[in-house]
Regions:
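Catalytic domains that recognize anionic headgroups
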Residues: 1-169
């Protein structure tokens, strides 16, 4: 198991990528939106490099990527809940052909659950399910990798359980 923690696209976006990775705008010039886009592009580049390295050198079987929260580059983040854009996170799962052969039920469950609602509070159970992590805290009903995943839009909450996902219009 390899775990990478990326600082990703947190503010100050201009400091989240090397200047030679500037695609939009001019290197070193503050512009929240363009700097945010460049930070996202850089994160994608780092993920691509990690994926290629692990696939060619480490016999990569499965990979999970997710962000801790979404962001709106047009305003500063506050501790108060502002809007649902912060709840929308990028996430992907890669599985090798060998992994799919050996764990077909998990693959099929992820496919059938791909349009279901999910919050990053459930990442622990998803990781346990995908990576065979044994724990007495693991609940397969809370893992997208199992066919008995139980949550719907109406069930889930965010912001320490105070905001219902179903309130997102």
């Amino acid at each position: 198991l390899v775990v990478l923690h990326l600082k990703g696209s947190h503010f100050n976006y201009l400091n989240r990528y090397p200047s030679d990775m500037t695609i939009w705008g001019k290197p070193g010039i503050p512009d929240s939106i363009l700097n945010y886009e460049n930070a996202l592009h850089y994160t994608d580049s780092v993920l691509r490099q990690a994926f290629e390295y692990c696939k060619t050198r480490l016999n990569l079987q499965a990979m999970l990527y997710f962000s801790d929260h979404g962001d709106n580059p047009t305003r500063h983040r506050t501790p108060q809940f502002c809007d649902f854009i912060e709840c929308r996170i990028p996430m992907f799962v890669y599985m090798s052909d060998e992994y799919i052969r050996n764990h077909n039920q998990r693959y099929e469950s992820l496919i059938s659950n791909r349009n279901k609602y999910f919050t990053n509070d459930l990442i622990y159970d998803l990781m346990c399910g995908i990576f065979d992590i044994k724990s007495n805290k693991f609940n397969e009903n809370q893992s997208l990798a199992y066919n008995n995943y139980r949550f719907s839009r109406e069930d889930l909450r965010t912001f320490q359980g105070k905001i219902r996902i179903s309130d997102d219009k």
